[in-house]
Amino acid sequence: MIKDLCTVVCRNKNLLMLVTAGIYILALYSALSGHTLLFSVLITFAFAAFLIKDYFKPKYILIWILIFYFGIYNTTSRLKDTDELLNLAPVNSVISGQILSIPQNKGRDKTSFFFKVNKIEYDGNVREFDNEKVLVTLNTNEKLKIYDYYKIKGRLSVPFKAGNPSQFDYGNYLRNFNVYAVFYGAKGAEPVFLNSDLSAREKVLQWINDYRQKIISTHSNYLSSPNLEILGGIVFGDDAVSPPENIKQSFINSGLLHILAASGMNVAFIFSFFFFFLSALKVNYKVNISAGIVMVIVYSLMTGLGASVVRATFMLVFVLIGKLIDRDAHSISLLAFVAFLMLLYNPMYINDVGFQLSFIVTFGLLIMTPFLMRGKNKFVNWVIGTVSIPIIAQLWVMPIQIFYFNNISLYSVFANIMSVPILSVISFGGFVSSLIATVS
């Protein structure tokens, strides 16, 4: 029976890629859990048994072993218990460096962002660094730009640690971003802009972010808070536009938080809009597809590159490249391959809730919706999809919601079913108004 199952895996590209990605993910979890030796022994013995029993071809066993141990190395080489800034904390200081993330307004005149620290001045001492980061929180609404350089006065501190097993550990959360300390700006002390030459890449990315900010500013002429942040979250995601905490909590309680996260629907809408627009202009098919790829990538950069957007962008780009070279993509294997690529680039994605939700929900939809939408009547399929997709998504997301948010709303499925048609209209209006804002 086991041999038959292994034979099926070897003959099915979807299952083969799924197993490969699963082995790599297992390696990451073994490294992050601190049980690397135990998992290594178990995996090695398991692969040896598969080889002896001739369940898999030797080349598969060799590839999987290499992937497993590379996953452990790739994770452990990036992990550290502390960094130089954490060793200095707590201390009043002045830091100089570069903003690395989109500055987010947290309400009540608070702005936060990740900051690369090049230099710190404290107690008459000066130290320079190559690659140290902190999460900065300032008491200001000053318009700060990603990739600009600043000097900031404040206090370097140790992030909050959990006091019991079920409590949120802020320090561990920041480790996912390779950040080990936090910095709070001094009251009344505005950040000082430092002149510095940006690279060509940084200038392009800053221009893209400025373009997004122009769109949001145009919307602010007609919308007030929190409607502005909600629309911005629907269009660009909460990585780019952060809604007020009370609004965000309401979406969490109702099981609608995904609405505020840019997702595959946004990416698909952007591509579809430009594809049909260029098709109406009789643009060459391959040129049309290529232009769509560029627009999708630009949009993903505008959103702040949240895990769900990166996943959707990668999948769509690979599908479109397949169209250009007349190749079809296998949905499950493509999803697994994209997960593998993202975790190869940054193993800490594995702890990102957005990453987990995006891939688990997409996987659930890919394996369940084809069985429900087999009919030939398009209207019937549309009705079935409208009702079943939110239910399927909620079923797959429920364990993660309980684990991270310690709650589950019984009406969330109904709320999702009701919100899908409305969300489509709001998204369409938001994207159209955003396009108008770019030319106004």
Language-model features, listed with the residues they occupy:
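N-terminal leader/targeting segments
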Residues: 1-86, 203, 311
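Functional transmembrane helices that form membrane-embedded active or gating regions
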Residues: 2-21, 88-92, 378-395, 414-417
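Membrane-interface helix/helix-cap signal primarily in integral membrane proteins
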Residues: 2-9, 64, 68-258
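Hydrophobic alpha-helical transmembrane segments in multi-pass membrane proteins
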Residues: 31-34, 54-64, 183, 243-413, ...
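Membrane-interface amphipathic/re-entrant loop segments adjacent to transmembrane helices
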Residues: 192-207, 253, 402-418, 428-440
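General structural signal for alpha-helix termini and helix-helix connectors
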Residues: 217, 221, 236, 257, ...
